[in-house]
């Protein structure tokens, strides 16, 4: 059995760690609320933009644009959105597992656009070519950052470096649930159903379509960045909460061991005293 001194030292260490994980949980909870608000605000905008784009594409069926044109697929691009830091449970692991499954099932050459250090570092050790990297986006992704990623990907697509592009990210479901998701980004698919809402376009539907298509790509990237950040904070809050609870249980077990060690020491001391007294008789 460990000595009482060793057990006390372990209790202090676990208690210090518990304070850290508790603080990290509170910080993650605060950031989660802000990230969740942004996700909720971004989703309707993305849906409405998609609806307008669908109406335009339907009304201007003869309009050709590089982002709408399908071509024979040889190289597929995966934009994988992971975190820059760890301590967020299975957030990165689950997404990378889904990405690996998609790569294994893919019949074409796959190239990665890594967003976040965790994904970048993981695939640097593998055999999948990473053609672009974006790290250090912080806890508050901006539209400017999303635009930079989108323009890079659009350039790769229009140059023929990529023939299809997919976004792989964690969709935010709730604070305790994140869903690894894959959606097609390029070429932009025309929705099968559109609303009956009538739109009046100025100066012309064709000019607006040309402007909206890149904007749509930027918006989708921005939305998925926000989804990923909210998911990351939810996963981190859950992980740190579990770590705090585990620390509490460990302290309780160590305290019980300490009490037993004290009791054993007292019993031994009493036995020695009684034994010494008996020897003097």
UniProtKB/Swiss-Prot annotation:
Family statement drawn from the similarity comment of this UniProt entry: Belongs to the ATPase gamma chain family.
Protein name per the record: ATP synthase gamma chain
Subcellular location, principal: membrane
Functional summary from the UniProt entry: Produces ATP from ADP in the presence of a proton gradient across the membrane. The gamma chain is believed to be important in regulating ATPase activity and the flow of protons through the CF(0) complex.
One Gene Ontology term from the biological process aspect of the record: proton motive force-driven plasma membrane ATP synthesis
Cell compartment(s), UniProt: Cell membrane
InterPro entries assigned to the protein according to its UniProt record, in alphabetical order: ATP_synth_F1_ATPase_gsu (IPR035968), ATP_synth_F1_gsu (IPR000131), ATP_synth_F1_gsu_CS (IPR023632)
Membrane topology, record value: Peripheral membrane protein
Gene Ontology CC annotations of this record: plasma membrane; proton-transporting ATP synthase complex
Phylogenetic placement of the source organism: Bacteria, Bacillati, Bacillota, Clostridia, Eubacteriales
Subunit relationships: F-type ATPases have 2 components, CF(1) - the catalytic core - and CF(0) - the membrane proton channel. CF(1) has five subunits: alpha(3), beta(3), gamma(1), delta(1), epsilon(1). CF(0) has three main subunits: a, b and c.
